[in-house]
């Protein structure tokens, strides 16, 4: 078995270092910076004192991670998934910035639990989660 000359091993070190330095910024491109912050809070609408079936809600949204934040809202009655909706919280978003808590799957007289997710879509169309919050919905 032939032994490699030692200078070849040392010659590879700068090549490996150069590759690492070139690829690391690419690997992290498009990801939010460590200094970003996000918050999400529930806002009841139409004079409501609690979130309720067929009631309207919206959210106070704040983030430095993107200028096109979305809120995805999912609700369950027990283990049954009953509601799934998405709203953009930016000026040219397609729909109104509120949710009406109702669907054909939503059973009357049964309380629900909802989880809101603040996120954005990266350049590849993947959702990037910023924060979440959960809240009960009265029957």
What feature does the model see in each segment?
Residues 2-13:
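Bacterial N-terminal signal peptides that target proteins for export
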Residues 11-22:
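Bacterial N-terminal signal peptides
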Residues 79-100:
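Solvent-exposed serine/threonine-rich low-complexity stretches and specific carbohydrate-binding patches
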Residues 28-58, 62-64, 137-139:
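Short, compositionally biased P/S/T/A/G/V-rich stretches that sit at domain boundaries
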Residues 124-139:
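Short beta-strand elements
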Residues 109-123:
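Short, aromatic- and glycine-rich surface loops/edge beta-strands on solvent-exposed regions
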Residues 101-109:
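Short, surface-exposed loop/turn segments at beta-strand-coil junctions that are enriched for proline
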């Amino acid at each position: 078995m032939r032994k490699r000359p030692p200078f070849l091993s040392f010659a590879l070190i700068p090549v490996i270092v150069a590759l690492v330095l070139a690829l690391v910024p690419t690997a992290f491109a498009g990801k939010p910076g460590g200094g970003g912050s996000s918050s999400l809070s529930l806002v009841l609408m139409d004079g409501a004192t609690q979130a309720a079936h067929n009631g309207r809600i919206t959210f106070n949204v704040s983030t430095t991670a993107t200028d096109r934040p979305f809120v995805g809202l999912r609700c369950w009655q027990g283990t049954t998934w009953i509601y799934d909706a998405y709203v953009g919280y930016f000026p040219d978003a397609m729909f109104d910035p509120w949710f009406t808590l109702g669907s054909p799957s939503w059973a009357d007289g049964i309380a629900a639990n909802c989880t809101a997710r603040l996120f954005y879509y990266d350049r590849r169309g993947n959702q990037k989660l910023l924060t979440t919050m959960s809240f009960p919905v009265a029957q």
